[in-house]
Amino acid sequence: MTAVLAYTSPAMGHLYPMMPLLLELRARGLDVHVRSLDTLVDQARAAGLSAERIDARLRPIADKHPDWAATNAKAALERSATMFAERAVLDGPDFRRAIEEVDPDLLIVDTNAWGALVVAEAQRRPWLHFSPYLVPLRSTGTPPFGPGLPRWDNPVGRVRDAVVGRLVFGAVERSIIPRINALRTPAGLAPVRSFDDLVLAAPLVAICSAT
């Protein structure tokens, strides 16, 4: 039987949006395994999935970097990015252990599990990058992620987006990309230059939205 291994970051809102996909795979006869929060393991098992908890050390890291306490968008993004980078040191090895236990044919990895994404990219199985929210990829005419700016599709708006993008999300990237590449290099992966590179490294990306 074809086996699937799904790995989420330590947040309820990251397993729930993934469940319709996992249940559909199970309905089609696949053996679906999940690694998620310990508080969600019983629910996943009740739904007919094989489930185990992720490394218990991952969840407390969020308490060290509360993005809600930030005073501006840039600071909030920096806190979140720092949290993901710290967790990556743990979720990468945790995911690798899960792969060794399950020996899956297909991997599904949460967008916020940066270490697990590196592990997935470095191995040879097919894999999916899963995001429970719209991914902040750059695109022409779209305001930069973070400040909540309205779309302003004219020359002045494009200048605004370029400047604000460098000051906010661009600044966060410059501080965090070296930490991501520090995980990638030992895995034999080429360095990334942006968050876009990290997301688009996957052979397939699934994005949930409210529309």
Model-predicted segments: where are they?
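N-terminal subdomain of nucleotide-sugar transferases
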Residues: 1-52
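Structural motif
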Residues: 3, 105-106, 204
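Short, acidic/turn-prone active-site loops that include or flank metal/cofactor-
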Residues: 10-12, 55-60, 131-136
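Conserved nucleotide-sugar phosphate-binding/catalytic loop shared by glycosyltransferases and other
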Residues: 34-79, 158
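A short helix->loop->beta-strand "cap" motif at the edges of active sites that frequently abuts
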Residues: 49, 123-126, 202-203
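Conserved nucleotide-sugar donor-interacting segment of glycosyltransferase catalytic cores
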Residues: 85-158, 211
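Active-site-proximal region of nucleotide-activated glycan assembly enzymes
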Residues: 128-211
